Design a protein with these regions (language model features):
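The feature captures the beta-strand-to-loop junction immediately N-terminal to the Walker
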Residues: 39-41
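Helix-to-loop junction immediately C-terminal to a conserved catalytic motif
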Residues: 54
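Conserved ABC transporter NBD signature motif
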Residues: 62-70
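Conserved ABC ATPase "signature" region
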Residues: 103, 118-136
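Conserved ABC ATPase signature
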Residues: 140-144, 148
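Catalytic Walker B motif of ABC-type/P-loop ATPase nucleotide-binding domains
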Residues: 165-169
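ABC ATPase nucleotide-binding domains
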Residues: 238-268
Length: 268
């Protein structure tokens, strides 16, 4: 085992917005090579947690450590080399070429006043190929569909080569083939030692992760592997029994799926 600290650790993090406490003593450890899915009903605090983990919002209590140092003390450029964040809203409007958006992912490596290196450009082109957005590289964001914009923004994050990826609803606007491609990118990064956390509303996508963090009302309710019975029970409970979790066999491998439950007495 390596003696290095976990890439990202949140200890007893709380967050208040006005009079509302949106996070309450949350503890999260994101390990290298791990894909963590964060799930919970609307208003559970998932996106708020991600902004605190990214150092974009200071917690009211507790602390977040990035590579063993408080995330808030990292110079912005150095932090961006270590940690990349995809926001839920996407910030995907504007008269800027798609390829220039992806190039922003390399800005922390070469600075505002320096031209990108050959390695920077190679990372940009590789990320755009991976997310299948090379074909519209010169087009403006405001000319792209929602799914195309999302792929550009995901490419920006992947181009950063950061050791920690925080992705808030990365599957938004993506059709099934591009959701699959996104999941493949996440899994490949985790397999290469990157620490990845994704906020997901689709429970079936979350069930593909290494570990699932279940939130409700600003608290962590449970965390565990998808096959863990206690984790599955917590998932069903926080979503008011809207689904059951069933074991499937796909291509000879065990998989878990959330199957919606409908009230059989409801009128048709």
């Amino acid at each position: 085992m390596s003696g290095l600290p976990a890439p990202l650790v949140a200890s007893n993090v709380s967050l208040s917005l006005g009079t509302q406490e949106v996070l309450q003593a949350v503890r999260v450890t994101l390990h290298a090579g791990q894909w963590l899915a964060i799930v919970g009903p609307n208003g559970a605090g998932k996106s708020s947690l991600l902004t605190v983990l990214a150092g974009l919002r200071a917690p009211s209590a507790g602390q977040v450590l990035l590579m063993g140092r408080k995330v808030a003390v990292w110079p912005a450029a150095q932090r961006a080399q270590q940690l990349a964040w995809l926001s839920q809203q996407g910030q995907a409007e504007g008269d800027i070429a798609a390829i220039d958006v992806v190039r922003l992912g390399r800005m922390a490596h070469h600075g505002w006043l320096s031209a990108p290196s050959a390695a920077d450009e190679a990372a940009v082109f590789a990320a755009m190929q991976e997310t299948e957005c090379s074909a519209f590289a010169p087009r403006r964001l405001n000319q792209l569909s929602g799914g195309e914009r999302q792929r550009v923004l995901l490419a920006r994050v992947l181009a950063s080569s950061a050791r920690v990826l925080l992705l808030d609803e990365p599957s938004t606007h993506l059709d099934a083939p591009h959701q699959r491609a996104m999941l493949r990118s996440v899994r490949q990064r985790a397999s290469a030692g990157v620490a990845v956390a994704t906020v997901l509303h689709d429970i079936n996508l979350a069930l593909l992760a290494d570990s699932i963090l279940v939130m409700a009302r600003g608290c962590v309710v449970a965390q565990g592997a998808p096959h863990d019975a206690a984790l599955q029970a917590a998932l069903v409970a926080v979503f008011d029994g809207a689904f059951s979790i069933e074991r499937l066999t796909v291509a000879g491998q065990a998989r878990w799926a959330a199957i919606p439950l409908f009230n059989s007495t409801a009128s048709t």
